[in-house]
Amino acid sequence: MKREDLLTNVVDDLSLEDLRDLKNLEIIFDKVYGFSAENVVKAVEILRDLIKEADLRFLSFTANLVSTGLRGLLADLIRREYFNVVITTGGTIDHDIARSFGGKYYKGSFEFDDTMLKELEIHRLGNIFIPFENYGKVIEEVVRKYIPEIVSVRKDWSVYELLWEFGKRINDQHSILKACYEKKVPLIVPGVVDGSFGTNLFIVSQFNGLKIDLFQDMRLIKDLIFSSEKSGALIIGGGISKHHTIWWNQFKDGLDYAIYITTAQEYDGSLSGARPREAISWNKVRPSARSVTIYADATIILPILSASLLR
């Protein structure tokens, strides 16, 4: 099979406006009601109240979603100020920068010979195909191009302010970094070194004196938490982005609103599979909190929840 035969259909970004025809889906789910449909309806109700009543609103998600068309939707949710803090993983920066600077991702399939893909120099992320040259090379070039400019301003940076600097230099309305910069929404990435962007920062820092101060990000979250009256979170996926979100909320006696979208299960004791009720025992979610867990693929559920905000 030829490489060009696999790289034909580009992944496009979704916008909130694309979902306008779905805005009444919650009515359908309410009529269905049974089983998981009930939780979708609950999530819609909680999300609306979270946005209306919580002054501190977290959007937490994992990086794999940014390789899909959900990237543009996540950027829209930030740009429309539904959320004012974003917590994610290092790969989010990688995918957002790669796609913002011309790295095209392609529609592929789970069922492919990965040894063959490696020989064709194609990464596979689930059913997304990423040509080698559209990922690491792009990120490396962007970091090497802009870090000298940024370091000329100052050498010590928090992660969220450094990401704003990159967002300022992006000309792509579907970019999460750009949306965060425009709305001055802090993009908190506790695992920033776990990825291509962080590795490239480390490499260039050995030559130009760049210093990353994660404690500045922690001080920001601390100030936001202690000054908030109510907090809520839409948490998509698990891992470090989920835990960092609920961890900090324990210092205000827990989240007031919590919506989990996950495919992980709790039987193995993992953080990713833990439900909001377990977080109550850790003081990370209030006993009185309104919470719900939807067991589903976020690429299906997030558009439905987001569309409900258009009603």
From Swiss-Prot:
Pfam families on file: DS
UniProt EC number: 2.5.1.46
UniProt enzyme class: transferase
Keywords: Hypusine biosynthesis, NAD, Transferase
Catalytic activity: [eIF5A protein]-L-lysine + spermidine = [eIF5A protein]-deoxyhypusine + propane-1,3-diamine
GO cellular component: cytoplasm
Pathway(s) it belongs to: Protein modification; eIF5A hypusination
Annotated GO MF terms: deoxyhypusine synthase activity
Cofactor: NAD(+)
Family annotation (HAMAP family): DHS (MF_00153)
Function: Catalyzes the NAD-dependent oxidative cleavage of spermidine and the subsequent transfer of the butylamine moiety of spermidine to the epsilon-amino group of a specific lysine residue of the eIF-5A precursor protein to form the intermediate deoxyhypusine residue.
Family indicated by similarity: Belongs to the deoxyhypusine synthase family.
The name this protein goes by in its record: Probable deoxyhypusine synthase
Species this chain originates from: Sulfolobus acidocaldarius (strain ATCC 33909 / DSM 639 / JCM 8929 / NBRC 15157 / NCIMB 11770)
Gene that this polypeptide is encoded by: dys
